[in-house]
Amino acid sequence: MISGDTILFALMVVTCVNWARYFTALRTLIYIMREAHPLLYQQVDGGGFFTTHGNMTKQVRLFSYIKSKEYHHHHDEVFTSKCDRVRQLFILSSALLGVTLLSSFIV
């Protein structure tokens, strides 16, 4: 029988891998945003997004833009597909984090 610690460790590994995928997709989205949507790139401080002095309100602006699916009206298909991917990966990673935390309290 598989121990609870093994299951918890496997969930942690899967969660970390999915968060890494999310951050990689987010970096790619910001890079594509520079050409596809320069105004939004400036609004979310694309150049300083992942720095220690990044502005949290500007990061929340990108989160609300993706959450409300405002990108569906954009003309660039690559940009909209990246926004969809970032949104799906965020939902998946958040759900996995919740399951991992829940299972850590149960095990």
Swiss-Prot record:
Main location: membrane
Keyword Lipid metabolism found: no
Transmembrane segments: 6-23, 89-106
Pfam families: UspB (PF10625)
Localization, UniProt: Cell inner membrane
Cellular component per GO, a single term: plasma membrane
Keywords of the record: Cell inner membrane, Cell membrane, Membrane, Transmembrane, Transmembrane helix
InterPro entries associated with the record: Universal_stress_protein_B
Membrane association type: Multi-pass membrane protein
Family: Belongs to the universal stress protein B family.
NCBIfam families listed in its UniProt record: PRK04960.1 (NF003435)
Protein name: Universal stress protein B homolog
Organism: Vibrio atlanticus (strain LGP32)
Gene that specifies this protein: uspB
